[in-house]
Amino acid sequence: MAGSWCVQRFAGRFCLRRDAERREKYLNSVLWMLFSGTEECAHCPEAMSSRDRRLIAEDIADLVDSTYWLDPAPLRRIVERQRRDVFLLRRIRRHGGYRRASYLHLLSRMPVDEKTVRAVERYTHSRNRYVRFCALSVQMMADMSALSSKIDAYSHRLSYFELSEVLRMLRQNVQPVDYEPLILSPNRNLRMLGLSVVWRFGIEDAEEILLRIVAENRSEESVGAMYVLCTLHSVITRPEVEKFVGGMNPVQRRVLLRYIARQGYSANALQVFIPEEEKRYYVSLVDSYKLNVG
């Protein structure tokens, strides 16, 4: 049994080393095609197996992930010429569940044409949430200018992880976005995306809108707006904030006040939110995050 384990371990390391060597070779070939202006993969004629085709697709995806303001047209021509999109679509059709989601995720990181976008549209209605979101990612990455309309048409709730992925796409594509229409949208996903944009990019001008959301006391958005206000280090000793925090359940309030303390707010800023019997605990909590320089 020990001998079998050693053989499997050695074989696994050998495959990883071989894949790394091939990926380096294929990446050099892709770069050569970009600089030479050709779409022929002349330097890797043996790339015929499905493993090799996936390695080339991963190289192209990593190249897109590692660059900003890259013209997608040359890479899109390479993808079409080498039929990497056809290969991935075939894999997506043949597999299901998380493996299908992984192929969709890989496809979302590559420049694809409108025909490919239409081919994955049906997967946005899958019962598997990972498949749904990865299919949506393909649509969004293909046309970032239509990101808001794609999310608006998406009929499922975006999780916080999925919202963070959308933010990553925005940063990668250096895509300008107006946060105010998002926050004021009737669509829940767009509102949460707007809050995420304000939080991620530290937009202090959104303070008035955030306070308005807190005052409206909408469960999910108001809690999110409170955390964003604290992240922006806004003044939180306001009547609307005090009223909202006072109406939170004890567990939510405790978590929020711990976050406020971590953001560097003083004990005085917390006084209006803290019940009398809990003041000693929160004063010691604030002191644990601050250094006495007296």
Predicted regions span which residues?
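Short amphipathic alpha-helical segments that mediate assembly, nucleic-acid/protein binding
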Residues: 27-28, 53, 57, 72, ...
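Structural detector for internal amphipathic alpha-helices that build alpha-solenoid repeat scaffolds
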Residues: 62-79, 101-112, 132-142, 160-172, ...
